[in-house]
Amino acid sequence: MTRYYFIIQIVLVLSQQVVAQSISQWRGPDRNGVFPESGLLKSWPEDGPELLWVNDNLGRGLSSVSVTDKEIFAAGLDDSTEYLSVLDFDGNQLWRLSYGLGGKTSYPDTRCTPTVEGDRIYLISGRGKVVCINSSERKIQWEVPAFEKFHGKHWIWGIAESPLLVDDKVIYTPAGHQTTMVALDKYTGETVWETQSLNDTSSFASPILIHFGGKKIIVNLTINYLLGVDAHDGQIIWNVKYSDIQTPTFHLWAPRNNTITPLYHDGYLFITSGYDHVGVMFKLTDEGNDIQQVWTNSTLDCHHGQVVRVGQYIYGTNWIDNRTGNWCCVDWNTGETMYEKEWYTKGSIIAADNMLYCYEERRGNFALVEPSPDDFKIISSFRVTEGMGPHWAQPVIHNGVLYIRHGNALMAYDLTSSLP
């Protein structure tokens, strides 16, 4: 009996590990912009990697896509309604389902990237409704008007958060006078916990999960605070008023435009925002019960294109104004700026197979870049011509295919074979 019980426990543990590894979400498995790929091309033909297909019927979207081993998931806005589109690997639409109303602010196009685990898809609408869609049944399993229910408060440009799954919980940050962050049961939508209120406004950043000191800590930003929350019970472990750290003298309102997902590695946490507000590195201390500031950097004030860590360096773009920015490299350990280089304008960045993938936001130029602290070394580049609007969506790489979203269009490129 003991032997069989032991076997069952092993099976359960392995099953939980498989489930944990199967989540497809915002900016990759660890939400840090690094995609676990190998065998990708180290240079491209003059016109770029081979374009496999284009689907231009997604609806308007600034959100990225999530890709599983079975399907592709994308959110899009038609008129004032948000839809989930599910595609096969030839770019054909398998099905489509409306799940909520879009935001009422400027740039109302979808911002939330679907979070997919098994046959469940989680989304946050532009008006703060948290939704679970059952892909097997192709219908909404549950929905919670969370922004309304928890009396949330959002900043000027609305809601842009992508939901985080932690164990059996869906995490959302409505902020406001009642709470700051909430956890919903991922199977039912029932409230598991809600944190105390910091009496603040939600940012445009998405949360991450870190493991430190034997704790699971959920980290996110409001417009003023960086906070760490105990994933088990929703207690706020620590918070820091980021907006008070070297507040820009020219753009006094700017520190509240936090769009960058916190970047974590080995006990250290980096945050940044645009408009001349400094990036800050923190160190977790006291078994995760506190954090302390390590360094600041005034060069890499990333607007909304995100940052990525490769080796001991952080890469991303800074903000010069809303139309321009340069490509930067900063030392993870010291905060020293290694370079600041001009290449068209600011944009998005991810990493895979020890290369950087850089997507500038105005003209759609896309580059394969060698990560180096010495220079912004472009190996190959091409231009994205399909779609419409700003090139703000984060690229995704899955099983050797590069997915680029531009407005209503999704393009798939082969990164494993060269054209003859």
Language-model regions, residue ranges each:
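Loop/turn-rich, solvent-exposed surfaces of beta-rich toroidal or solenoidal domains
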Residues: 299-371
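Short loop/turn segments immediately following the C-termini of beta-strands
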Residues: 28-31, 77-79, 126, 175-176, ...
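Blade/loop signatures of beta-propeller domains
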Residues: 21-50
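Short coil/turn segments that connect the beta-strands within blades of beta-propeller domains
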Residues: 69-70, 118-119, 167-168, 214-216, ...
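Extracytoplasmic beta-rich repeat domains
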Residues: 52-66, 96-115, 143-165, 177-178, ...
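Structural motif
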Residues: 81-84, 180, 228, 277-282, ...
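Short loop/turn segments that connect beta-strands within beta-propeller blades
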Residues: 88-92, 134-138, 185-188, 230-233, ...
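Blade-level signature of beta-propeller repeat domains, shared across WD40, Kelch, NHL, RCC1
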Residues: 364, 388-420
